[in-house]
Amino acid sequence: MVKREKTIVILHDIRSMENVGSIFRTADAAGVSKIYLTGYTPAPVDRFGRKNAKLTKASLGAEDSVSWASEADIFSLI
């Protein structure tokens, strides 16, 4: 059995919801284990628990397949 390393992606200060959605879709296809959203990068769900329509449309459901977390400070991740 081949041991696979976990791959994470950090998205920092990306303004475009469509670009974030596209990265979720690409990360899902590439087998990324987790995406961290830092700075003002939009999350798939807003602070009220509603899905961001533009991001969800661009991700084609990948936001439900790839684990993600929002972090205020990128330096706490590095």
PLM regions and their residue ranges:
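RNA substrate-binding interface of SAM-dependent RNA methyltransferases
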Residues: 2-78
